[in-house]
A protein has these predicted regions:
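Phosphate-backbone binding interfaces of nucleic-acid-interacting proteins
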Residues: 1-115
Length: 115
C-alpha cells in the first residue's frame, strides 16, 4: 500500500470532489497476472456493479473481503492495472504490516454516501 502524501494539502473544495460510497464485495478473484492484486466485483447500489483492483493479496485473505461492506472512492478516473480495469478504489488503513479495510459500523445499503 502506498504511504500517505503528508506534504500535500488540498482545499475543502478539492476534497468535496471525491465521492465516497458504501459498496458490498460480491466476488474476490486472484488477479490473473499479478501476485499482490485481487480483482473485486462490488455492488455500489442502484443495481450497478463496479470492478476494483486492490493490492491486498498476501495482506488480507480473500475470505475476509468477500461479502464485506467497504468504503469506495467511486468517481476516480478508471485505470487499467496489469490488464484489469479498476473503476474505483477501496479505502484501507495501514499500521506497519497490518491492513484494515474501512467499513461502516452498522449495516447500510450499498450506494450510501459517506459524508
Amino acid at each position: 500500500m502506498a504511504e500517505a502524501a503528508e506534504s500535500v494539502v488540498v482545499s475543502f473544495e478539492e476534497f468535496k470532489k471525491l465521492r465516497l460510497i458504501i459498496g458490498r464485495v460480491l466476488e474476490v478473484k486472484d488477479h490473473p497476472s499479478a501476485d499482490r492484486l485481487y480483482v473485486l466485483r462490488v455492488d455500489v447500489g442502484g443495481g450497478k456493479e463496479k470492478q476494483l483492483v486492490a493490492g491486498l493479496k498476501g495482506r488480507v485473505p480473500a475470505e475476509q473481503i468477500q461479502g464485506k461492506l467497504i468504503v469506495v472512492a467511486d468517481n476516480l478516473k478508471p485505470a487499467v492495472l496489469r490488464g484489469e480495469r479498476s473503476e474505483g478504489m477501496l479505502l484501507a488503513a495501514t499500521d506497519g504490516d497490518k491492513v484494515t479495510i474501512l467499513t461502516p459500523q452498522t449495516e447500510v445499503s450499498p450506494g450510501s454516501v459517506v459524508s
